[in-house]
Amino acid sequence: MAASRSAGEAGPGGSQGRVVRMKRRGGRGPRRGPAGGGEKALKRLKLAVEEFVHATSEGEAPGGCEGRGAPVSFRPGGRKSRKELRKEKRHLRKARRLQRTAGPEQGPGLGGRSGAEEASGHRQDTEERARPAPSRDPSPPRKPRPSRVKAKATAATAKTRPSAAATAAARKRALLAANEEEDREIRKLERCLGLNKRKKKDGSSSVPLSFARDGLDYILGALESGKNSGLYDSSGEEEEDAGQTLPESDLESDSQDESEEEEEGDVEKEKKAQEAEAQSEDDDEDTEEEQGEEKEKGAQEKRRGKRVRFAEDEEKSENSSEDGDITDKSLCGSGEKYIPPHVRQAEETVDFKKKEELERLKKHVKGLLNRLSEPNMASISGQLEELYMAHSRKDMNDTLTSALMGACVTASAMPSRLMMEHVLLVSILHHTVGIEVGAHFLEAVVRKFDAIYKYGSEGKECDNLFTVIAHLYNFHVVQSLLIFDILKKLIGTFTEKDIELILLMLKNVGFSLRKDDALSLKELITEAQTKASGAGSEFQDQTRIRFMLETMLALKNNDMRKIPGYDPEPVEKLRKLQRALVRNAGSGSETQLRVSWDSVLSAEQTGRWWIVGSAWSGAPMIDNSHHTHLQKQLVGTVSSKILELARKQRMNTDIRRNIFCTIMTSEDFLDAFEKLLKLGLKDQQEREIIHVLMDCCLQEKTYNPFYAFLASKFCEYERRFQMTFQFSIWDKFRDLENLPATNFSNLVHLVAHLLKTKSLSLSILKVVEFSELDKPRVRFLRKVLSILLMETEVEDLSLIFTRVSDNPKLGVLREGLKLFISHFLLKNAQAHRSADEANVLREKADLATKCLQGKASLRM
């Protein structure tokens, strides 16, 4: 025990402390006085240190001495160089290492006993307090005499020097143990860094270049989560473990690096680092002593078991690392994208600038609307067009719509003239800028009206919105379909508020509706009369219902005087201004929105199909859903015979089948006309009505005038149907020689009927080359003109032929008709007809010829 205590005093806490004090006080000894006593003491100390160093270099531990023969603290008289201090430190570490490795083999000898006692004294403080055990932070020892230090060092050297063979065997075992410890440490570090799967070609592990380049090859272990993170709690333990197991060359290089780092600090920091190192070495000596006491065979089995456990730990670490990767990927996938601060700041700057720009735009537009009037309509509309060119369409549409809604939709009733001027501005921009302007404003107005109508309002917002919709129709932004949809919904509910709104709408657009679609207005009036007669007893005040019915009757009879307060002059005046401003607009003539009430309200689900290029997603196409609905309705209501007949007639699309079944199941041509319009077809789909109608007419075995009257109704309804019929008839003209007899005869009667009813003009014959007529075309023209002349009244006949007399482009047609009438129609008239019929034909042919020559010849 005395030997171990002396070893503890000569360890890092004792000898190194004395070295530090030598560095502090070494230069002060020779200066104490002129006497030579200090120099003699210094020489004796040097001799004692040299003997002690020689003894430790031969393999003896300073703590292995019996008694207290180890060198104790002394006060040197001179300063040693740094090289000598590093050399002494290396020798001390080697001696302690040899003592630990050789201790188990010596059994209960002196050296092993001292190491074991020192370890047990470190673990059990209570047993060792009776003895002066080595402290981790030793206090400055008492000054011994130089002669006593020298004697104790000599005695320790003589008593504890081991043999050369034992020293070599102990050194070999220490190297093997150090190699195994180093392998375990490397595997431990690899598991902690997650690098156990990365292997070089020679089998050794490697750190990724990115880790080494960024300095993460060392600090990455401290960031790892899990139980392995505790392996790197103390950098001192890391260094001490490496110092215990590395070879001598590595140990020397490490000690040199440490000494170089110590040179940079002051002496106090050096002392604290050495004391901490000594403390960690004492802790590790306990583990090494316990492992050294086991037998070689048991140690090998234990190593095998550890290898197995290491393999299991590697698998667990691999699984945990894979789970961590999956978790990190899921977090990265579900989390938001990281935005760097400079990008975030740039976005905030852009948003702030955008907000300021929108505020300026809003003020500018609002200022223009505040100055709006009829005289400056042209200048304000021009400035708004420039704003549309300078800003995005979306920003301008939103800003203009919000400004107009704020100006027109108020709690009090707006003046009619002011309302019309604002809507006229929208109409001008709708025609000059694009239809999305009017479409955006219309959608906002309809949605606002629907919300206020459902939830009610005490003010006049609902009336103002209804007036805006009426004037949008007056100034040709929307067609009559939207107005009729609204009126039908109001008649369906038929409350006092509904009656008031119906009267307001009829007062503003009643006669325009009658002009555009008299049939729909007639049906609406009939439905309103039926509803009023059924719900008359529910209203206490019958005067409002009576006034509404009188207004509808006045519209039906086209009597403006019976509508109180009706003045069409302001609307007509603003319409003239509109025509003057949009005359040179390049947006085309078909700018009116043919959209229904339900389509506007369901625009978010079905898309804004009335705006060219509008984006939409999330629901099936509107046409497909509409066709599916029609197909379901068709299967449920139409017999299988009609469907089979449609298949035979080559109605190969849903639209054609629906049109065919509608025509076949109608009561008369008026019923068919109404049902076909209610199909809600658009553009190309509407043309299919004419194509199906022509096919059905020509496929009849005998001529059926039902198709001719239905065709006349469509031609009177809108001009686009006239153009479709004209092109369809021209297609048949080119293929006359291939038509069967029944188809040929039905086509003759259809064309003659359309000419007699003035649904089509004689200009449809302008494609006929009268100079190159073949037999089918001569026969076709002879029959058509004979029916036209014989079955038409004189007044109607003169109008039919006069329509083509004043057009200079139809000169060839006029000359060809006169030549055909004189040579092909009248030449053999008496041979095929009776005398009376021939005379009537000749008289009407002369009248037709005079009409073709012009109005002057007709007067003569």
Swiss-Prot record:
Disulphides: none
Subcellular location per the Swiss-Prot or TrEMBL entry: Nucleus, Nucleolus
Chain segments carrying region Necessary for nucleolar localization and for targeting PPP1CA to the nucleolus: 1-269
Basic and acidic residues composition-biased segments: 115-131
Protein's GO biological process: hair follicle maturation; ribosomal small subunit biogenesis
GO MF entries: RNA binding
Predominant location: nucleus
Domain MI: 654-770
Domain named MIF4G: residues: 362-559
Superkingdom assignment: Eukaryota
Motif mapping: Required for efficient binding to PPP1CA and for targeting PPP1CA to the nucleolus: 307-310
Skewed-composition ranges (Acidic residues): 249-267, 278-293, 312-325
Protein's UniProt keywords contain Hydrolase: no
Region called Disordered, residue ranges: 1-172, 191-211, 226-339
Compositionally biased spans, kind Basic residues: 20-31, 77-99, 142-151
Keywords: Nucleus, Phosphoprotein
Biased composition (Low complexity): 152-169
InterPro entries: ARM-type_fold, CWC22_splicing_factor, Initiation_fac_eIF4g_MI, MIF4G-like_typ-3
Gene Ontology cellular component annotations, sorted alphabetically: nucleolus
Stated role: Plays a role in targeting PPP1CA to the nucleolus.
Quaternary organization: May interact with EIF4A1, EIF4A2 and EIF4A3. Interacts with PPP1CA and PPP1CC.
PANTHER family in UniProt: CELL CYCLE CONTROL PROTEIN CWF22-RELATED (PTHR18034), NUCLEOLAR MIF4G DOMAIN-CONTAINING PROTEIN 1 (PTHR18034:SF4)
Family: Belongs to the CWC22 family.
Annotated protein name in UniProt: Nucleolar MIF4G domain-containing protein 1
Organism: Homo sapiens (Human)
